[in-house]
């Protein structure tokens, strides 16, 4: 092979490798998946890219926090207890969506917004497969 034919092949290989190296960095730029007490969760929903993140449908629970006028609230705190009253999850988020990886079952949720100024208690039922979605409107 001559020097002239090696150069384009080498350039193409380097370009491909640099593109592949950029993919993991791009994938990590989104909202992080966190963990509290062994439960995976994410705080998301700020911006179109976050709301369209393909990872979110895999979470069995999606709680969306909004004001009475429909605007998103970005500071929810959530505590989830199981049917026996045992706390299984608690977190403070900086985005209006709280996505939680809970096993199937019935849970009680205590949620606060606007730095604890408003609170709401409600039940959720998590089924096997699919996503339980609840919009919580706080005045």
Regions found by a protein language model. Give the residues of each.
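Short, surface-exposed beta-strand/beta-hairpin micro-motifs centered on an aromatic residue
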Residues: 95-101
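A short tyrosine-centered beta-strand micro-motif
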Residues: 105-111
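Short, acidic Ser/Thr/Gly-rich low-complexity loop/linker segments typical of extracellular
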Residues: 85-95
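Primarily secretory-pathway and cell-envelope proteins
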Residues: 26-76, 80-81, 113-139
């Amino acid at each position: 092979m001559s020097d002239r034919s090696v150069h384009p092949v080498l350039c193409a290989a380097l370009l491909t490798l640099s593109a592949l190296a950029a993919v993991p960095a791009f994938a990590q730029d989104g909202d992080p998946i966190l963990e509290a007490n062994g439960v995976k969760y994410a705080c998301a929903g700020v911006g179109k890219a976050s709301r369209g993140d393909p990872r979110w449908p895999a979470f069995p629970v999606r709680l969306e926090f909004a004001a009475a006028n429909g605007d998103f609230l970005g500071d929810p705190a959530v505590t989830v207890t199981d049917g026996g009253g045992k706390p299984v999850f608690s977190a403070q988020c900086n985005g209006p969506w709280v996505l939680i990886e809970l096993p199937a079952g019935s849970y009680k949720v205590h949620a606060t917004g606007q730095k604890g100024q408003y609170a709401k208690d409600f039940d959720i039922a998590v089924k096997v497969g699919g996503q339980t979605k609840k919009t919580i409107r706080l005045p």
